[in-house]
Amino acid sequence: MFQSDGITDNSISGHPDIFIYQDKNHLIVSPNSPVDLFKFLDINNIAYLKGKKDVGNKLANSVQYNCLSTPQFLFHKSGYTESAILDINKHKEFVQLPQAYTRCSLVHLCEESYLTSDRGIEKVLLKRGLSCFYFNPEEIIIRDHDNGFIGGAVGIFGNKIFFNGNVELHVDGQRLKEHLLNLNFEIINLSDEHLYDGGCILFV
């Protein structure tokens, strides 16, 4: 479904969070997403909107859909966001971040609690009085780079948090596990390998 070789950089090729923006009520998909993705959405009667801009292999056109939305905020780096995403989030406060690969690097856990692997993002959120757990990106595997990001290795469904790999193998794993249990999350490790940044785990 997510064979997207040749569209964007090899390290993020096939990553859902590069091609798809998702919030509680919307799914916005890059128009040049793999055909099989559109077939899957249509066959399963999953509502979505097509974005206006294609994903490409430069920074500016590979981060357009990689933003994070909560009921109150839209987090991204200003000037990089797909216009269709801005349109449906006009009522929210835009929070300027230093990292354009926002969804890769930031997870909204619940209410005012966040998880990030980016010190710049952590600084912005803490300055706003939000709770932010910093998770070292080292040991998160990704193709063609030294390390990936925590957002690309995580998915949340209800009170369950899924890890692409085993979070307990990471140097910060035990601390994060305790933090998540304090927030009443059920932790599900999808393998016994080190965490792998595959572009976020989305539930549609």
Describe the residue ranges of each PLM region.
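Histidine/cysteine-enriched polar flanking segments
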Residues: M1-V204
